[in-house]
UniProtKB/Swiss-Prot annotation:
Coiled coil: none
Record field: catalytic activity: IMP + H2O = 5-formamido-1-(5-phospho-D-ribosyl)imidazole-4-carboxamide
Pathway(s) the chain acts in: Purine metabolism; IMP biosynthesis via de novo pathway; IMP from 5-formamido-1-(5-phospho-D-ribosyl)imidazole-4-carboxamide: step 1/1
Family membership noted in the UniProt record: Belongs to the archaeal IMP cyclohydrolase family.
Species of provenance: Halobacterium salinarum (strain ATCC 700922 / JCM 11081 / NRC-1)
GO biological process, one term: 'de novo' IMP biosynthetic process
The keyword Hydrolase is annotated on this UniProt entry: yes
Gene Ontology molecular function terms on file: IMP cyclohydrolase activity
Protein keywords: Hydrolase, Purine biosynthesis
Name of this protein: IMP cyclohydrolase
Annotated function: Catalyzes the cyclization of 5-formylamidoimidazole-4-carboxamide ribonucleotide to IMP.
NCBIfam families named among the record's database cross-references: PRK04151.1, purO_arch
Lineage: Archaea, Methanobacteriati, Methanobacteriota, Stenosarchaea group, Halobacteria
EC class name: hydrolase
Length: 194
C-alpha cells in the first residue's frame, strides 16, 4: 500500500519517512538546526517547493517532525512557549495543505519536554490535532487520520530504521528522534536509501 510520507509520534520517540513516487531522488542530511530533506546529486532540477525542507527540528525542549516547511513555524512557536497542541494547530491552519496536484496534507508531530506528545494533520477537508499516549501514525494518503500503530523503537536509530522498513511502498529515507529523558533533550538519526 502506498500511503505517501508519514510520521509516527509518541510517546518518547518520533519518526518521519519520505515515501515518494514522484521525487524519489532525495536524502536526509544533518544540519545544526536539525534534519533536512534535500535532492540527491543525481536528482533532476526542480522548482517544486515541496521537495526540500526541514523535517526534524529541536528547540525549547521540544522535537518537531513533519513533511514540509511548516516544521519551522511549529518549532518557532514551541520555542516561544506555545503549548504543542496550539503550535501544531496554528501552524497547520496558517500553512494549510500543500497546493499541489494532489492537495497533499501537511503532517507533523511534537515531543514535549514534559513527556507528552502530539500529532496533527491538515487536509483539504479537516484539521486534526491530538495528544497521543502510544505510537500514532498519520500519513499523507490512505491513513490520513491519526491511528495507533505497533512501533517498538526506543532509540532514534531504531525509529529511523523501523520507519524506513515499514511495510508501505516507495521508501526513500527516514528520520528518527528519541527523548533522552524528560527535559534532557533528544537524539536524532537518519536512514537513507541503501
Amino acid at each position: 500500500m502506498y500511503i505517501g510520507r508519514f510520521v509516527v509520534v509518541g510517546p518518547s520517540v518520533a519518526a518521519y519517512r519520505v515515501s515518494s513516487r514522484s521525487f524519489p531522488n532525495r536524502k536526509l542530511i544533518e544540519r545544526p538546526a536539525g534534519l533536512t530533506v534535500v535532492p540527491t546529486a543525481d536528482a533532476e532540477e526542480t522548482t517544486n517547493p515541496y521537495v526540500s525542507y526541514n523535517c526534524v527540528r529541536t528547540a525549547g525542549g521540544h522535537a518537531v517532525v513533519g513533511n514540509g516547511s511548516h516544521v519551522d513555524p511549529i518549532t518557532e512557536k514551541v520555542e516561544r512557549g506555545y503549548p504543542p497542541r496550539d503550535a501544531l494547530t496554528e501552524a497547520l491552519l496558517a500553512m494549510d495543505y500543500e497546493k499541489d496536484d494532489y492537495d497533499t496534507p501537511r503532517i507533523a508531530g511534537v515531543l514535549a519536554p514534559d513527556g507528552t506528545a502530539y500529532v496533527g494533520i491538515v487536509r483539504a477537508d479537516a484539521v486534526l490535532v491530538r495528544a497521543v499516549e502510544e505510537p500514532t501514525l498519520v500519513a499523507t494518503y490512505e491513513k490520513d487520520a491519526p491511528e495507533a500503530i505497533g512501533f517498538d523503537a526506543a532509540t532514534a536509530a531504531d525509529a529511523a530504521r523501523e520507519a524506513y522498513s515499514a511495510a508501505f511502498e516507495h521508501a526513500v529515507c527516514a528520520a528518527g528522534v528519541s527523548r533522552r529523558g524528560v527535559g534532557d533533550g533528544y537524539d536524532t538519526a537518519v536512514v537513507n536509501d541503501p
